[in-house]
Amino acid sequence: MKILAIGDVCGSLGCEAVRKWLPALKKEKKIDFTVINGENSTDGNGITPESAEMLFACGADVITGGNHSMRRKSAYSMLDENYFVLRPANLEGDAAGKGYCLADLGYTSVAVINLLGRVYLDRVAASNPFIAADELIQKARADGAKIIIVDFHAEATSEKRALGFYLDGKISALFGTHTHVQTADSQILKNGTGYITP
């Protein structure tokens, strides 16, 4: 199975780039499942129902979020109502939405978990992502997930690496988002988990 993970899509120009190249890329590479971080898919920052709809129309199966997920009030009802639009699961307080979904593809099922880091992200209250990850992995297994993907939206490489090593062998892959900088450290960790920092 081929899973495509796309880091932060930024603004209308980022959405336009996705619209232009994603359908052809999915066809060329025979992509089975696509996760896009859309927390900045609206100009400025945040996500709106319109930007999410465009990302789904281009081929996203799940849209994840981050520290800007709650920036636009127009997103709140979408986060509550659309099962496949996520915000970080470990946001504290009464945040709209959820940070986990399970996609049944017929031949397999894919759980997507969205978590927020805490290092250098002190403007957003988030609980311990390690504890949240353990709880949601347990839920994913109980739900029958065959594949578990984590989008860890975090600033510090050290925090991303730490969670990657902690979850090695417990999940299929962890991809980092937030920094808007591609890294060249994609790897399979010792116990079989795919990992990349961005």
What are these model-derived regions, one by one?
Residues 1-198:
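Acidic, metal/ion-coordinating pockets
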